[in-house]
Amino acid sequence: MTNLQERGHLLTELVNPNSLNLDQLSSLELVELFNSEDQKAVAAVAAAKVQLAEAIDSTAERLRHGGRLFYIGAGTSGRLGVLDAAECPPTFCTPPELVQGIIAGGAGALVRSSEDLEDSIEDGEAAIAGRHITQLDVVVGITAGGTTPYVHGAIHAARQRGASTIFIACVPAEQVSIDADIDIRLLTGPEIIAGSTRLKAGTVTKLALNMLSTGVMVKLGKVYGNRMVDVAVTNQKLRDRALRILQDLTGLSREAAGFLLERSGKWVKLALLMHWTGLEKDDGDRLLSEHQSNLRAAVMSYQNHNQS
């Protein structure tokens, strides 16, 4: 990492010429300014599309072979990683340990600012050691300004353990360099409030993490078409969603879809396979296991076998 005591030259620290009169704007003008600046977040993701796609493919391959995905960061970056990780179990029915968020300062830093804890390289290294990271795992270091010692310590420790490393920052590589397998730069420019990286940098980070985790889960067969067929049916809202998916894809009545869902053990993916093939629960479960829980692959295998 570039040793930086003076950070004023970093892209995320520069003064935005478009917001010099911020304290004189009307509320409508302020909203319009934010809306205009936020377009740069979408453009920044588009500019990094090749690296993001590479990150999706690399991560999916590791997870397919038993690896785990870790996000690590401090402050806003750390909170966004924890948020994205926390959404994977209800959306894709993944075990909590498959995608994990690590934030400097631990759980307390989620609700109370603990930015002073980001300055320790050793703490970042210890966080990696504490998760028993191996060569199967993927570690994504997130730091808007690119300089967070906690994140750099974690990336260095992860590389030493043979893990795949991905770096996400909102400054160009010539300002802050790092040795990582995939280097993603999301360049949104100076913030509306100079240095407040919870704004555009936070927005673009959320967009990138949405793409990364969702893309990985798509590659792992967690969706069928654009349907959430691995949804965890843990409350009334998610049960309703599960029933609507079954109704839409099978043409069944809501009552029949509910019966099918119960027969499958509340697993939408298995319920669909049972309906389309006529298999019972255990046989359907076995067929899915043979195809790494990929519903489309399981259905095609069944059809090919029965046509031959």
Swiss-Prot record:
An example GO biological process term is: N-acetylmuramic acid catabolic process
Pfam families recorded: GKRP-like_C, GKRP_SIS_N
Q: Which reaction does it catalyse?
A: N-acetyl-D-muramate 6-phosphate + H2O = N-acetyl-D-glucosamine 6-phosphate + (R)-lactate
Q: Which domain of life is it from?
A: Bacteria
According to UniProt, this protein's pathway is:
Amino-sugar metabolism; N-acetylmuramate degradation
Instruction: Give the SUPFAM superfamilies listed for this entry.
Output: SIS domain (SSF53697)
Q: Does the keyword Lyase apply?
A: yes
What sections of the protein cross the membrane?
none
Specify the SIS domain's residue ranges.
59-222
- GO MF assignments: carbohydrate derivative binding; carbon-oxygen lyase activity; ether hydrolase activity
Q: Could you name the active-site residues?
A: 87, 118
Physiological role: Specifically catalyzes the cleavage of the D-lactyl ether substituent of MurNAc 6-phosphate, producing GlcNAc 6-phosphate and D-lactate.
Q: Which PANTHER family match?
A: GLUCOKINASE REGULATORY PROTEIN
Indicate the family of this protein: Belongs to the GCKR-like family. MurNAc-6-P etherase subfamily.
Question: Additional comments on file?
Answer: A lyase-type mechanism (elimination/hydration) is suggested for the cleavage of the lactyl ether bond of MurNAc 6-phosphate, with the formation of an alpha,beta-unsaturated aldehyde intermediate with (E)-stereochemistry, followed by the syn addition of water to give product.
User: Under which name does UniProt file this protein?
Assistant: N-acetylmuramic acid 6-phosphate etherase
- Cite the source lineage: Bacteria, Bacillati, Cyanobacteriota, Cyanophyceae, Nostocales
